[in-house]
């Protein structure tokens, strides 16, 4: 709180694709620098899907997916830890420090911020038997003390989605699940999803079908009618889950755009989709 005013809290999620190229990481870091210069408290959650797959190949590991989710055995968990907390976390940290962003890179397991539990076998569409995803976590508990302390000291947390269970077993947590858990546990004003596509399109091949604004109540109808398909369905389902957990709005922006995050927070012109929680 500054001068009696509530500090704006912003949660930014970036996928591994966003972090592959140095120029893209530097663009993201410049954007974050502008946002924190405006007084916001920022937390970044990052994935590392492409990096895990590539590192797995180098280590002779085959990536296995069921219903779009990675199956994580013990060797693949080691690759995930190296890719997330090592490669992507370190690369993002370096870009942020270059942009004068006081970032701290750490797994979500640190200080018990997020405690996981091994996901039980799940019934998923298209699979004859329940799927055992291996060393993959569901969220059991969020203890926000670490984030609150980092924010109070002026730092920007960069969180990878590695957690431990109550017995200290390292687990791979989906980055989407980490975002929704943090939104539920903390007072988050805005969530920004930085992706390869700047928002929601009815047809990715047709720029005129871009949807600049939506209410969360519109999402189910768009999916049921087939108006959005493919990866857009999963993205909108993620947005709906985030808004249900308490965020006021979610903006989807493209990582190729300069200062896309700052522009979304300031309602400046730009190519993006903003989804708001419907009034009660």
Model-identified regions with their sequence ranges:
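C-terminal catalytic "cap/lid" subdomain
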Residues: 2-280
